[in-house]
UniProtKB/Swiss-Prot annotation:
Main function: Endonuclease that specifically degrades the RNA of RNA-DNA hybrids.
Cofactor detail note: Manganese or magnesium. Binds 1 divalent metal ion per monomer in the absence of substrate. May bind a second metal ion after substrate binding.
Main location: cytoplasm
A Pfam family of this chain: RNase_HII
Protein name: Ribonuclease HII
Localisation: Cytoplasm
Length: 217
């Protein structure tokens, strides 16, 4: 585990894009990221986050690099801090099937930005060019390079995981609480046995194939 000093230095290193935007005259820089582009089931969720200038949040990193315990702690820390502005966007399975996952992801991001309490004047977006009235910068692997995007990734991931746990209560046979809709061996086996439920993405290949094979509920 990194020391407090090392974590503070890492936070500063990953603030380079935010600092550059501020030097250019922007003041409300929002990081934007998504969770759930790849799963076979469940919505796609986006997070947006504006971190206060001059405040260090130790441990902020790409949500995929954090343990569930670390991620949950940081999620609650961000939501409970009155100086942090967080927003969430959720796009349903039906909408994903209607417009495709890429466009649905962009739609979720726009929703997340709109749900912020204050309007950002610059966006740092993980991996996507996002058509938006607010100027933006696409950052490849931004969740590992920008603290704002990393914070947004934590918000999106935790929020979506909570949604998938709720879906598990409705359809426990699929194990949504464990794999969160991703195409694990156990999920594919359940899909083969039970067929897809209403929360499966029918435009995604394994689900589409199970429907064509006639195992749809």
């Amino acid at each position: 585990m990194k020391s407090t000093v090392e974590q503070a230095m890492l936070f500063e290193e990953k603030s380079i894009f935010e600092n550059q935007a501020i030097e250019q005259g922007y003041s409300r820089v929002a990081g934007v990221d998504e969770a759930g582009r790849g799963p076979l089931a469940g919505p796609v969720v986006a997070g947006a986050c504006i971190l206060p200038r001059g405040k260090v949040f130790l441990g902020i990193d790409d949500s995929k690099k954090l343990t569930p315990k670390q991620r949950r702690y940081l999620y609650e820390l961000l939501l409970e801090d009155p100086e942090v502005d967080c927003g969430v966007g959720v796009v349903s399975v039906e909408r994903i099937d209607e417009i495709n996952i890429l466009e649905a992801t962009k739609e979720a991001m726009v929703q997340a930005i709109a749900s912020l309490q204050s309007t950002p004047d610059f966006l740092l977006v993980d991996g996507l060019f996002l058509p938006h009235k607010v100027p933006s910068l696409k950052i490849i692997k931004g969740d590992a390079r920008s603290v704002s995007i990393a914070a947004a990734s934590i918000i999106a991931k935790e929020y979506r995981d909570e949604l998938m746990r709720k879906l598990h209560v409705e359809y426990p046979e699929y194990g949504f609480d464990k794999h969160k809709g991703y195409g694990t061996a156990a999920h594919l086996q359940a899909l083969k046995h039970f067929g897809p439920c209403v929360y499966h993405r029918k435009s995604f290949s394994p689900v589409k194939e199970s429907i064509q094979e006639g195992v749809c509920q």
